Amino acid sequence: MPAERSPIDTAKFAAARRAVDFVQDGMKLGLGTGSTAAWMVRCLAERVREEGLRVQGVPTSSRTAELARELGIPVVTLDEARWLDLTIDGADEFDSEFNLIKGGGAALLQEKIVATASDRMIVIADAAKEVAQLGAFPLPVEVIPFGWQSTRMLIEEALIGLDVLGREVTLRRSGEAPLLTDEKNYILDLHLTRIGHPRQLALTLNQIAGVVENGLFIDICDTVVVGHGDGRVTVRDLGASRNIFADLGE
């Protein structure tokens, strides 16, 4: 690993390394997707290599699967694992109730399936990801390509009656073409600025024809590990007044 990192990378690495401490021998793990989750995969691989830690990893994207295999982490499918002990993943935003926005890496469908098939979900994030109210980060919604314009119109219509600010819905692109998820679906990003009732919004979106899944993770995350630019880490459990500070130096 590089000797010097930016404060943001230091925070991500610190959170990832602390979260990997929760992994025990013999566990079946959900491996998240994104820049912070990539640090976690590297830290996990280090424990596998140096400690002989025995784990099975279920990746939440083709990118994570490729990285895990390259680093020597045994990879299995969720169908093979059936149920997981722990999932560790990043988040684009989280609030005080550990509601999350995920999907900035376009892997929200597999991420949610894996997280809900786990006994526990730990989110790793830098301190900037904590918000008083969700909505500053665009909310991803995965939709099937067929009729996506109609699906977008239905989403825009549904937003009118909900407690949100901002109703712009855009198609995520990769260059000139629509971005494709691992399932060959599209992503619509909802630019809402504020989400008053995340649960209501999540339920409403998933009732719209053409919507596959949305990036709101409600009642799924149990623990958040927050990294700071100076290497400190805060571990927070939902419902417990517990803050653990640790200096994770190089």
From Swiss-Prot:
Keywords: Isomerase
Top-level taxon in the UniProt lineage: Bacteria
Pathway entry: Carbohydrate degradation; pentose phosphate pathway; D-ribose 5-phosphate from D-ribulose 5-phosphate (non-oxidative stage): step 1/1
Catalytic residues, chain numbering: E111 (proton acceptor)
Alphabetized GO MF terms: ribose-5-phosphate isomerase activity
Entry EC no(s): 5.3.1.6
Any Gene Ontology CC annotation: cytosol
Binding site for substrate: T33, G34, S35, T36, D89, G90, A91, D92, K102, G103, G104, G105, K129
GO terms classed as biological process: D-ribose metabolic process; pentose-phosphate shunt, non-oxidative branch
InterPro entries: NagB/RpiA_transferase-like, Ribose5P_isomerase_typA_subgr, Ribose5P_isomerase_type_A
Catalytically driven reaction(s): aldehydo-D-ribose 5-phosphate = D-ribulose 5-phosphate
The keyword Plastid is annotated on this UniProt entry: no
HAMAP family: Rib_5P_isom_A
UniProt xrefs under NCBIfam families: PRK00702.1, rpiA
Subunit structure: Homodimer.
Function, in words: Catalyzes the reversible conversion of ribose-5-phosphate to ribulose 5-phosphate.
Family assignment from sequence similarity: Belongs to the ribose 5-phosphate isomerase family.
Designated name of the protein: Ribose-5-phosphate isomerase A
Classification lineage: Bacteria, Pseudomonadati, Pseudomonadota, Alphaproteobacteria, Rhodobacterales
